[in-house]
Amino acid sequence: CIRDSYLATAGRAVARELLVYRYNQLDKAIENAAKLGFRDGAALYPMVTVNGEECHNEWEITFEEIHRNGAVAYAIFNYIRYTGDTAYLADCGLEVLLSVARFWAQRITWSGARRKYVMLGVTGPNEYENNVDNNWYTSYIACWSMRYAAESAAWVRENRPADYARICAKRRFDETAETKRWLEIADGMYFLSLIHISE
């Protein structure tokens, strides 16, 4: 979403505006997810858009290249890490992170056979294999996003309590219940290894 080189050369204000753009498209991302059956404020950012709605016409990309949600979350992390602008997290970023984490928590399923959480029917960022199960990158960025959302919620609660209360009311966020679920999924995620690939 925002490259390190761009952060280093374009200036903090420009980089922040790119993330504010993502925040301004959040309600459309929630609508996009709702069209696919997701609920409770889960968001799926579009692969291609002019107004926040998905404009891509290849279903594998639209429905399966969902790692893009992780790129949005990582852009927030990277921007704050690089600039120190923690105000962005309370102003805009946490709402995006909560909605992305809600998407992952609903998209990931439990496998009784593996006794782990799995990610079925995705296309990874290399686009070489479509409609695969347990793409390592997609599973990893999903788990990372849920953990980062939980950490960010705790940070905003402790450091910006008025903003935290506003966000909880606006997004109907129950930190205790939701973050418990996110961390349970992240801790129990199945990841392919060389042993599993050779089986």
What are these regions, as identified by a protein language model?
Residues C1-I2, I195-E199:
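Conserved small/polar residues in nucleotide/adenosyl-binding loops
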Residues R3-A13, E60, A71-T86, F103, ...:
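Well-ordered alpha-helical scaffold segments within catalytic/enzyme domains
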Residues A13-Y74, I80, A87-D91, V100, ...:
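Helix-terminus loop motifs that line ligand-binding clefts
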Residues A15, G93, T179-W182:
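Hydrophobic packing residues in well-ordered alpha-helices of helical domains and bundles
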Residues Y21-K28, E95-R107, W144, Y148-E151, ...:
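Alpha-helical scaffold segments in carbohydrate-active enzymes
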Residues V50-H56, R115-V122, S139, K170-W182, ...:
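Catalytic cores of glycan-processing enzymes that make or break glycosidic bonds
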Residues F103-F173:
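Acidic/histidine-rich catalytic neighborhood
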